[in-house]
């Protein structure tokens, strides 16, 4: 009888021990906020291997891992019902999280999302060959660049979603994004290089010199000055906040009049090209 009770006690002790190790709660852990609105639970005590236990729930999936540090950094892993593997990597300074989904082999990427502390993020989706097919870059201010139909050479379709309207264009193999707006004979092109540098150009197919528009880009002020027959008519400023403002020149084309007005619709941008 004593042996029986001893056996039962040992089993219960092992179960309790397993529960303590496998599950974290508010009593035995600390919650740490991560970029992207995620949270990770960090055990208050080290395990038998001298590691801190980590737990997080992302998209209703429970992820677990261990870390040498108790600040929330480390790597957590899990498995979805379709056997695909999930990995969450938290930077040592908690400034960045990398959330990856792999196929069942644990090597072929399905998707990857990197989120920074300023709420900006880059999300990539991959095709069956493990090549990038879609990419979305969200800036800290909420505006974003969306890339779809990405081919093996890196080219594809592009879209910039601003605060109030959207610009569409293409992604070149060299990483250059070109977004275009057409109004009559005038084409406005916003170019975003792989480095993030922005340039803006204006082309007019009008053959009449007296009405033909030209544009001059000033990278220092991010301003496109539009002229007609060599006389300045208006300035378009592409601000750091990813907004566009327009301000007209006087009839002589020498001084700016009034105040710069923010463009809030695609129609207003097209009107500025008239």
Swiss-Prot record:
Its main location: membrane. The keyword Disulfide bond does not apply. Keywords: Cell outer membrane, Lipoprotein, Membrane, Palmitate, Plasmid, Signal. A lipid is attached at residue 17 (N-palmitoyl cysteine). It is a lipid-anchor. It is found in: Cell outer membrane; Cell surface. One of its GO terms (cellular component) is cell surface. Pfam families: Lipoprotein_1. Residues 1-16 form the signal peptide. A lipid is attached at residue 17 (S-diacylglycerol cysteine). The keyword Manganese does not apply. Belongs to the OspA lipoprotein family. This is Outer surface protein A. The lineage of its organism: Bacteria, Pseudomonadati, Spirochaetota, Spirochaetia, Spirochaetales.
């Amino acid at each position: 009888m004593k042996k029986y009770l001893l056996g039962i006690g040992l089993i219960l002790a092992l179960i309790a021990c397993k529960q303590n190790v496998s599950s974290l709660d508010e009593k035995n852990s600390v919650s740490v906020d991560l970029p992207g609105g995620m949270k990770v639970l960090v055990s208050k005590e080290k395990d038998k291997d001298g590691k801190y236990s980590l737990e997080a729930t992302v998209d209703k999936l429970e992820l677990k891992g261990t870390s040498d540090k108790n600040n929330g950094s480390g790597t957590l892993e899990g498995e979805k019902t379709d056997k695909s593997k999930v990995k969450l990597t938290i930077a040592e300074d908690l400034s960045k999280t990398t959330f990856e989904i792999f196929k069942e082999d644990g090597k072929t990427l399905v998707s990857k999302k990197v989120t920074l502390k300023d709420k900006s993020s880059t999300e990539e989706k991959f095709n069956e060959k493990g090549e990038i097919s879609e990419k979305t870059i969200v800036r800290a201010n909420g505006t974003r660049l969306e890339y779809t139909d990405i081919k093996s050479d890196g080219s594809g379709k592009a879209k910039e979603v601003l605060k109030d309207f959207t610009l569409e264009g293409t992604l070149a193999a060299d990483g250059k994004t070109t977004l275009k707006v057409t109004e009559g004979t005038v084409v406005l092109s916003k170019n975003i290089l792989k480095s993030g540098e922005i340039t803006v150009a204006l082309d007019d197919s009008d053959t009449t010199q007296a009405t033909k528009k030209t544009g001059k880009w000033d990278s220092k002020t991010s301003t496109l000055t539009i002229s007609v027959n060599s006389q300045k008519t208006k300035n378009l400023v592409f601000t750091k906040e990813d907004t566009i403002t327009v301000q007209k020149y006087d009839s002589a084309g020498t001084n700016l009049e009034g105040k710069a007005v923010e463009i809030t619709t695609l129609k207003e941008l097209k009107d500025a090209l008239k």
